[in-house]
Every structure is written in structure tokens, then in C-alpha cells.
Amino acid sequence: WSKQIDQFIMHNGVSFDAPILNRLTGSNIKLSQVRDTLIESQLYNPTREGGHSLSSWGQRLGFLKGDYNDFTTFNEDMLEYCLRDTELTRKLAHKLSKEGEKFSSKSYELERKVRAIVDQQEKNGFAFNLREAMSFLATLEEEQHELENQAQEMFKPKEVQLKTKVKYIPFNIASRKQIAERLEELGWKPSKFTDKGNVIVSEEILNTVKMPEAQMFSRYFLLQKRTGLLKAWIEACQDDGRVRGRVMTLRTITGRMAHNSPNMAQVPAVYSPYGKECRSLWTVSNPDTHVL
């Protein structure tokens, strides 16, 4: 039946509606048949206030989407909800037709193809060496703990006089404020500050400070970043040994993609500290047939 229809207008049709209909009804809705109003909304204004959901568009157009959550069995309320969704999508398509007059049809066709490719990428995921990652994480965390202990020996707790007693505040190596205070006590003259006047402490700035304490802090921040990445990858690794990060193809004002759960665009470059080790964790299921 799908062959008899020239165009399907759907909101999130490329990623959801068309694949679901093909799976459940045996239809063969092709990518070229789908006009996806979600992609159009994102393409014409990536940072649209309120977002791109059909519900948000219902509020903008003064035609509320409605609220229905129980899809256990078919009933008249469900049908009414479906019909209202359909009418709202029709109104949205009309609205976006006007918005899209300044855009070429090729721009939409390109984004539609990209979305389909990214959907396949998300479905496939990336093979991940979980065992090696956990071993690598343990190695880095061990050094982290050593630096934490070393910092406690170098910087004794600060004494704070309260009304009735003396309180001792231990040094926190993860506190940039405390790091700035202790380095200033050792003679450091910071040159970069926030708008509120707080000292800016970063890995890059610490690398320029010729003090062994500053180098220790810089090293700790590096380990903190790498262990954070490793933990996110390990947590996201599924039972089949693959990680499937989410990718939003049209989420930034410049049209660049946005990534999360985890951010697969943040894998360190091979030339950066521990970059080679991090990248070696990403592999292929069958090295005889695939390469990464």
C-alpha cells in the first residue's frame, strides 16, 4: 500500500514513524517518500526557542497536541489522540512550507540522508573492549589516589577558628579554589580571572606554572578527565559489547551535530595524553571483515 502514496508527512518520520510502520505493517516506505517536519524544523532554525517537539509546535500554533499515555489496547481516546496528532502535523507542514522558502530542496534532502545514516550508526554502535577499559581505568585511578595522598601530605588541613572550637578543613585536590589559594601562598601570581574576580585554574594554566605542586595538580586534572571518559564509556557499554551514543544532526546554530550518552566526539586524539590508549579501546567485532 505504501507504493501508492507519493509522500508521507511525519514528525520524526525518518528515525521513528517510517521504520516502525515498515516493521509492523510490512510496508516499504522509502526515505525519498518521507517529508520529516522534525528535520525541517531543525534545519530552518536549529536553536528554536522551546525546542522542536510536536508538543512545542502545538503551543506555537495554538493547537495543543493533547496528552495520552496508555497504549495497551486500542480505544476511541487513542484514535482521537492520533487524529489530533495528524491534524497538528498538517498545520505544522503548512507553516514550515513558508519557513522553508529560503532553503533549497537539496539542503533538506541532504539532512534527511544524513539523519538516516546516523540512525544506522546509532543502531550499529561501536565495538568496545570493556575488559581492557576497566583495566586501564583501574591503572589511572590508582595514580589518582596516589596524587590525592601526596597532596594531603604536602598541604596540611587549614585551621578555622569557630566560636567554641577549632575546625580543621582538609585540602581538597579537586577544588580549584583551594588550589589557587595554596599556590598563591607559595608565591604564584595568577594573571587570569573570572568576571567575578576569581582565579582561573585549568590544566593549561597550571602547565605554565613552574612549580612542582602546579604540575601535580595539572596531572590530577588530566587523570580526572580521562577517568571520567572511561567511566562514561564503560557505563554505556551494552551486553553485546557495543556503545551506542546519541547524535543530534541539527542541534547547533552552525548546523554541527551534537552528541551525548556518551559523547562519541570526545574520544581524545591519538597525539594527546593517553589518546592512543583511549582510541585502542574502540575496535571491531570481526577484524577479518571490518576495520576502524
Residue ranges of predicted features:
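Conserved "right-hand" nucleotidyltransferase catalytic core of DNA-directed polymerases
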Residues: 60, 64, 68, 77-279, ...
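Conserved DEDDh/DEDDy metal-dependent 3′-5′ exonuclease domain
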Residues: 1-99
